[in-house]
């Protein structure tokens, strides 16, 4: 196992781990990605029913292996107010407060992480384990199971990645090594996101090596990529001037990965919030994405007049609701004794249930305006959407799914990844889309080539070979 640690969140651990997975796969290794604890609102269904972070799914793609629940044994999905939904081995344990989570991680969490590593080790030659945040959060060291706890299980070496683009990279690396437990497990240092001439760093790199006793394995240049993001900040971008596609960005928006087809086709889109709600009146396509708290996000839209603007434009613009967005477009949402009116644009209602639905689904778009071949998607939701009539949007292996309004301009579905469907993308945006799998392969290869040409891969392979 080789672990990829970072001096901070956003240092590039996820993409570096992805690139290394591809590099080692090309070198003939059976590689598995791993992240003990991931906090992310971007998740995907694997093995038909288990929920893991989309980042580990992508890393498994890079390793050319099937993703499993053991590659991300613990997933945290923030729900606000100091609580997160905890998912263990792909299944939800429900919402836990911070103290409840710490009790869980120190007991069941530690055991599950270790068992997951052992399970993967039986099937693969090499594990590329990604850390989380920084290993030097000194207020949390006894409860940090995502970083040094993982590498200390087998005393495996780590790469410490520093982000030079945000400045202060030498201090952040030296400070991390000074504060983290078991700095002896860090064997290599990597500088990431270098803009300009890397040779300018050489005096500093030599001094850093002398101060730390660690080898700088390489300097990776800054490289734009259009790969699926891990967190919401990966989808922050300058407003696309002139774009007629708007995404309603309510406070509890989740599954940003549904926007990936817009990203990798360079299709411009803009977010709409309370500050620029009037932009909806000029949109050709309005997307209501998933929501971690449908009731709160409905209230947000009502408080800021977003709901009225959407309703006013329902006969003019195309409107697509995905998962929580679909629920909000319906007539009513009920959770026990709590209920709220939806926007009333689709003939559907939602009843929330205790059991979470997590499943892969085969579907084909099948309605008056769109039709297509059978595709793979997935569902992640608590609410059961009940059709009250109207046309279905899709046919699935589980029966009819989704809803289309009478004017055939408002669409709702629980299927994540729906915009990757060629028929849907063409109808909604007026543009053609390529094969997503081919695009992913190409972009993974491109970034892996950048990393491979920038670091001493031979040193890493020599270590991996010595452990066989």
UniProtKB/Swiss-Prot annotation:
- Domain GATase cobBQ-type: where? 242-424
Please identify the protein, giving its name as recorded. Probable cobyric acid synthase
Which GO BP terms apply?
cobalamin biosynthetic process
Q: Which GO terms describe its molecular function?
A: ABC-type vitamin B12 transporter activity; catalytic activity
Gene name in the database record: cobQ
Name the residues annotated as catalytic in the UniProt entry.
Answer: 323, 416
Does the keyword field hold Transmembrane helix?
A: no
PANTHER family annotated for this entry? COBYRIC ACID SYNTHASE, DETHIOBIOTIN SYNTHETASE
Tell me the PROSITE patterns matching this sequence: GATASE_COBBQ
One Pfam family, short name please?
A: CbiA
The pathway that the record names for this protein is: Cofactor biosynthesis; adenosylcobalamin biosynthesis
